[in-house]
Amino acid sequence: MTNLSVNINKVATIRNARGGNMPNVLKVAQDCELFGAQGITVHPRPDERHIRYSDVYGLKPLIRTEFNIEGYPCDKFIDLVLKVKPTQVTLVPDAPDAITSNSGWNVKDNFDYLSELVDTFTSQGIRTSIFVGTDLANIELAAKTGTDRIELYTEPYATYYPEDRDKAIAPFVEAAQLAKNLGLGVNAGHDLNLENLAFFNKNIPWLEEVSIGHALICDALYHGLQETIALYKACLNS
């Protein structure tokens, strides 16, 4: 079964909009686990405009499921990950001012750098995942870095799903199959939601994990957090 990792960045965004500690990011993470999430994801950025580095340190002793820290591997991020030692680190090629992730790595141009990072994190017992698109040559190179997994950037799938879901999913199935053949675990994330998640998961039954934040928090405004997590898990069990 595919694990649901809840990205709690948007919870931190709401907190930071007003100051103070409401909602309490640490409690929300614990409640997500209580309600059935199999993981918690955070994406700290250098300006700490949502998740703060202090949040990450605070979350570490509380998380009882899998803890995934994703982000651009600047020196500050690398130091954070090595100190916290999460279950998984997901390497994302974000510019510091990016509103959200908008592409996967060009592994060819960053091969030596990514290989070095993978070796550094692996030596500390941290599972590694590289954020990529569906380019097959890119995935083959990702496997050669020694990474444990890739995370497929699913925004193109979500964009074209309403027009032609079979056409939208096709490159992702091909990419995920190649990754599986190369011995890589496959994660996915970005713009997955209650409308498109079940079809994605059905077509890639070996999917290990989806990381979902923005859509899930939006749905929770209507359904409540507990019911929303149940709805997303139902998509992954269908």
From Swiss-Prot:
Q: Which SUPFAM superfamilies match?
A: Pyridoxine 5'-phosphate synthase
A molecular function (GO) term: pyridoxine 5'-phosphate synthase activity
Q: Which InterPro entries match?
A: Aldolase_TIM (IPR013785), PyrdxlP_synth_PdxJ (IPR004569), Pyridoxine-5'_phos_synth (IPR036130)
Question: Which Pfam family, just one, is annotated for this protein?
Answer: PdxJ
Tell me the residue numbers annotated for binding 3-amino-2-oxopropyl phosphate.
Answer: 7, 18, 191, 213-214
- Coiled-coil region list: none
Tell me which GO cellular component terms the UniProt record holds: cytosol
Q: Where does 1-deoxy-D-xylulose 5-phosphate bind?
A: 45, 50, 100
Keywords, A to Z, come to: Cytoplasm, Pyridoxine biosynthesis, Transferase
* Active site, per annotation: 43 (proton acceptor), 70 (proton acceptor), 190 (proton donor)
Which locations, inside or outside the cell, does it occupy? Cytoplasm
Top EC class for this record: transferase
Oxidoreductase found in the keyword field: no
The record's EC number reads: 2.6.99.2
Q: Where is this site: Transition state stabilizer?
A: 151
Residues of the signal sequence? none
- Disulphide bridges in this chain? none
What's a GO biological-process term for it?
A: pyridoxine biosynthetic process
The pathway to which it is assigned is: Cofactor biosynthesis; pyridoxine 5'-phosphate biosynthesis; pyridoxine 5'-phosphate from D-erythrose 4-phosphate: step 5/5
Subunit structure comment from the entry: Homooctamer; tetramer of dimers.
Functional note: Catalyzes the complicated ring closure reaction between the two acyclic compounds 1-deoxy-D-xylulose-5-phosphate (DXP) and 3-amino-2-oxopropyl phosphate (1-amino-acetone-3-phosphate or AAP) to form pyridoxine 5'-phosphate (PNP) and inorganic phosphate.
Q: Which HAMAP family match?
A: PdxJ (MF_00279)
Q: What is this protein called?
A: Pyridoxine 5'-phosphate synthase
Species this chain originates from = Parabacteroides distasonis (strain ATCC 8503 / DSM 20701 / CIP 104284 / JCM 5825 / NCTC 11152)
